Amino acid sequence: MRDKISESTQKIFHAVWERIAPFHEMIQSRPAVLSYSGGKDSSILLHFYFWLWIEKKIPAPCIYHLDHSIRFNLEQEKKIFEYADSTFPFSKIFKKKNIPALSRRLGKTLEETGRAFRYKDLKKISDQYEGYIVTGHHSSDYLETILLNLIRGGGWNSLRTLGWYEKNRFRPLFAFSQEEIETILQSEFWKIFEDESNNSDEYLRNRIRSYIIPLLLREGANPDRIYKNFHRIEKPVSKIFSKKNSDHKIPSFLKIDIWVLNDLSQRERKFFIDRYLRSLNLYPTTRNFFRDLTDLLQKENSFSLENKETWFWKSTSSDLYLIPKNSPCLREFRFEPKEMVLKWNGNQKKIPPDLIPDLCPAGAKIRKNGMSIEISEILRQKEIPVPVRKMLPILRGERKVDVICLSLWDPKIGDIVADREVEILPDFQEPGV
């Protein structure tokens, strides 16, 4: 027998659906894996997705539940399964793990162990379904987590925890105000299965929830407003969508103004660089790597630094370049001889039939302004990053370099043409690249 959803709750659900518009493409195209505990928050989450499915806005989700073996209540776990099975016509994955025993073996808290196991399991399932994970965190949970992290010695990132979408985990309850959550809980008569461990003062989070949060609320703290101060709702980067649904082009590189970086504090600088990396669909820098990068920036010399995903390059006078290691500018060009089209770095150029594309060999020169100039010197002056230089195409004719194809690196930069008449046809962008 399916639960009823009142008109007032449906109005809230509709308003929330409009608020999460930046995520519509993801929600409509990929199945959700719902992390369901049986408690109040996950019950709202489950019914919200049930309503979205009834309204034909989303594909059928999958319900995931983990018995942590903390309740020692087999009867309640059985009731949770029976309720979910009889109420929601979705696929279900119910698992049991002895989290207390695993916690003792790993030397971690019950909360840390349970969270790590759940997310590892959820990741496997979401990968299998080619979907995304959904959890029931909301702004009060965020306030608890801030305090928990600060007590444990957390820094600036403690304020930015629990984002709208990160690591393929979506948290739509942040779109509900605390007042709306209370309204739903008072209006509906859905079955709630509270974990008895939530009432135990044995756990730090519970003590924060029971004693500190009420005090802050009485003093005027607003969890919704605090969360919005540190989080913006933004359209996710393209890799969360299936390839057929994504036409977003990720840049082959990004450049950060060095004067802007120099005016920032260490924390602001890391946040700024990590935001640029996110735009490239890359992970943020680690603390140790960022320290090494900062040391090099302060020396004001040219450098090239890399981690697993990215090249960080800067000349003495240039801005800081961020180049993904899978960037098209680090791959060899493609040449289509029938059309005489040269393609590289997401750009393309039609070339005259008497020229041949090639890579620049060491020591190669080009005749310019009556002088024979080393191409490496030209690339240095033009501030072409070192990792890119060996892949930048040139055009040869009569055994000499006639053109350095700088426009394929950056269309705003003109090609370098040797001192002889060479017909260079206009550049054009490759459609859809």
Curated annotation (Swiss-Prot):
Per the record, the coiled-coil ranges are none
Q: Which UniProt keywords apply?
A: ATP-binding, Cytoplasm, Ligase, Nucleotide-binding, tRNA processing
Q: Name one GO molecular function term.
A: tRNA(Ile)-lysidine synthase activity
A Gene Ontology annotation in the biological process aspect, one of them, is: tRNA modification
Q: Where in the cell is it found?
A: Cytoplasm
Q: Which domain of life is it from?
A: Bacteria
Work out whether the entry's keyword set contains RNA-binding: no
What Gene3D superfamilies does UniProt report for this protein, alphabetically?
A: HUPs
Q: Which Pfam families match?
A: ATP_bind_3 (PF01171)
Q: Which GO terms describe its cellular component?
A: cytoplasm
SS bond list:
none
- Known EC number(s)? 6.3.4.19
* Cited InterPro entries: Rossmann-like_a/b/a_fold, TilS/TtcA_N, tRNA_Ile_lys_synt, tRNA_Ile_lys_synt_N
Q: Does the keyword Magnesium apply?
A: no
Q: What is known of its domains?
A: The N-terminal region contains the highly conserved SGGXDS motif, predicted to be a P-loop motif involved in ATP binding.
Q: What does this protein do?
A: Ligates lysine onto the cytidine present at position 34 of the AUA codon-specific tRNA(Ile) that contains the anticodon CAU, in an ATP-dependent manner. Cytidine is converted to lysidine, thus changing the amino acid specificity of the tRNA from methionine to isoleucine.
Matching HAMAP family, A to Z? tRNA_Ile_lys_synt (MF_01161)
Q: What is this protein called?
A: tRNA(Ile)-lysidine synthase
Q: Which organism is it from?
A: Leptospira interrogans serogroup Icterohaemorrhagiae serovar copenhageni (strain Fiocruz L1-130)
User: Which gene produces this protein?
Assistant: tilS
